[in-house]
Amino acid sequence: KAFLRQPTGIGWKVQGKRWFWLAAWFGPAVLTLLGAVLYFAVFPSRLDFSGSWLVAAYGGEMDAQTLRSQLGVSTLSYLLQNGLFAVLLAPAINMFPALGEEVGWRGYMMPRLKERFGLLNGRLLGGVVWGVWHWPLMLLVGYEYGTDYLGAPLLGLVVWCVVCFALNTLLDILYEKTESIWVPAIAHGAFNAIAALPQVLVTPADAYYNVLGPMPIGLIAALPMLAAAVWLTLREMKQEEKN
């Protein structure tokens, strides 16, 4: 790859087909939506529009009706306002804090893992390494799923590695196809912006099931992202065999 021959080994140019930039910007929102729909299709009783999550988020001092009448905050308004911000503006903002991880994981680690272990094994190993990197925070402070959740702490550690494989693969594909580290940085920033939004649709008590969904870091809600990662990797492997 030409970008590996650059002095830093990282592709810094703003380049690549428009399709990949659009996929990076809007793809995480689409996958998050699909994951939430799948989760609530499996667990329809957990879909909650009462505003109980908002009540807890605002400190519990006002009930849902008071939040609507005095502050104009409802589940629908929260989803619309924060969803529009997360989709339209946040990827550009979050791109910069995400850039550091992208330089390290996708820019430096992934090309070398794929060169040594092959496409599929490299992406599998890269996802596990990225996931395990977060384990200390997960065990010490409840990063991602909290400390009291279904199957804690073992299930969360395993699920997080599955999620990291899926996300790492999609980010790696974006970098591979564009040779520009800015593209996966945008996608990473977009994912960080939108991922927590489905949580407003469950009660605080259902945070116990966060390891399953409705956020795309849950096993069930992550299935669309995982399916996309596996399908794209298998397609890429078939193309390599033909060549």
Language-model region placement:
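Membrane-interface interhelical connector segments
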Residues: 62-70, 138-152
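Kinked, hydrophobic transmembrane alpha-helices enriched for aromatic residues
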Residues: 129-141, 184-203
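Membrane-interface helix/loop boundary segments of multi-pass membrane proteins
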Residues: 99-132, 172-180
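Hydrophobic alpha-helical transmembrane segments
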Residues: 64-94, 157-167, 214-223
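Membrane-helix interface linkers and caps
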Residues: 1-27, 38-61, 97, 112, ...
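C-terminal membrane module of polytopic membrane proteins
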Residues: 147-156, 189-243
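Transmembrane alpha-helix/helix-exit interface in multi-pass inner-membrane proteins
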Residues: 36-48, 101-102, 123-143
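Residue-level signature of the transmembrane alpha-helical core
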Residues: 25-29, 87, 91, 95, ...
